[in-house]
């Protein structure tokens, strides 16, 4: 049986027109290998999913302690109610939670200024040294969970809102600085070159040429992180960092199930208020 061929014409900017002959059987062979590779990949993925289900659901779950479906529903039913006597005592922790997120985000933005300056490739003052330092600060902030930061600051500063503020601030640096640095790296360099030609240093270039271009985008990043920080600040109280999370922890320890539900509703209310404020601010400023 004669071979079937395709004539493939290729053009290179540095070379004249070339003509290459490819066998049809070679194309079929390549496609078959690609299908085999995909099938093997799918089988590996299915095996990993089945193994994960086996380990997490069947081996690590205490089914005897969980009981029947009726017992599970009975346990869940204990939380169906509100402790109205607790409501007046939630105002101060709710305000504290809100202020932890605000002050933590503000402090994080302040810390982000040098981290962003160092971590943006096109404005970093001394690239071989400052650029790795800036990127390292971002990586450390993002790689450590806010609960771990809160535990660290509680151990250093004691219980209260202050450890929560510092934990929120340090955790915010990674996201805000990284996204801001990437926005700065994509700006038009014409205004920066013009200001630099007048003798301005890198910080002045950042302040007067770069920042006006990226300010709307940076404000959007900060508002987005602030929304997340409201959720974080509500949870940090579980490790003693103040706010509604601390009240939640106490209700759990005293087995006040209706109190737990009341605190959860308060947390949801704070989050929704934060979303409304963020949406309104974004529409007015950005």
Please identify what each model-predicted range represents.
Residues 159-225, 276:
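Membrane-cytosol interface at the C-terminal ends of specific transmembrane alpha-helices
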Residues 87, 91, 95, 126-133, ...:
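Alpha-helical membrane-protein architecture signal
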Residues 155, 229-267, 286:
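Glycine-rich helix-loop "coupling/hinge" segments at transmembrane-helix boundaries
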Residues 220, 261-286:
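C-terminal transmembrane helix and the adjacent membrane-cytosol boundary/short C-terminal tail
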């Amino acid at each position: 049986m004669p071979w079937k061929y395709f004539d493939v014409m290729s053009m290179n900017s540095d070379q004249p027109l070339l003509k290459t002959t490819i066998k049809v059987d070679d194309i079929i062979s390549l496609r078959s290998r690609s299908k085999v590779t995909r099938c093997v990949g799918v089988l590996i993925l299915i095996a990993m999913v089945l193994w994960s289900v086996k380990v997490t659901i069947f081996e690590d779950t205490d089914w005897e302690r969980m009981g029947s479906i009726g017992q599970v529903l009975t346990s869940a039913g204990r939380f169906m109610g509100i402790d109205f006597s607790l409501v007046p005592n939630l105002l101060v922790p709710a305000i504290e939670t809100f202020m932890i997120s605000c002050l933590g985000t503000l402090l994080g933005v302040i810390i982000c200024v040098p981290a962003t300056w160092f971590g943006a490739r096109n404005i970093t003052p001394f690239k071989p040294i400052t650029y790795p330092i800036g990127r390292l600060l971002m990586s450390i902030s993002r790689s450590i969970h806010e609960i771990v930061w809160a535990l660290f600051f509680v151990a250093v500063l004691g219980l209260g809102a202050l450890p929560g503020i510092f934990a929120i601030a340090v955790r915010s640096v990674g996201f805000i600085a990284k996204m801001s640095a990437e926005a700065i790296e994509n700006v038009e360099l014409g205004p920066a070159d013009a200001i630099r030609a007048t003798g301005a240093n890198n910080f002045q270039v950042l302040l007067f040429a770069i920042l006006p271009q990226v300010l709307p985008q940076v404000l959007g990043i900060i508002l987005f992180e602030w929304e997340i920080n409201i959720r974080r600040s509500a949870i940090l109280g579980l490790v003693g960092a103040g706010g509604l999370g601390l009240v939640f922890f106490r209700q759990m320890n005293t087995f006040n199930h209706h109190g737990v539900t009341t605190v959860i509703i308060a947390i949801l209310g704070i989050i929704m208020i934060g979303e409304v404020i963020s949406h309104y601010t974004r529409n007015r400023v950005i």
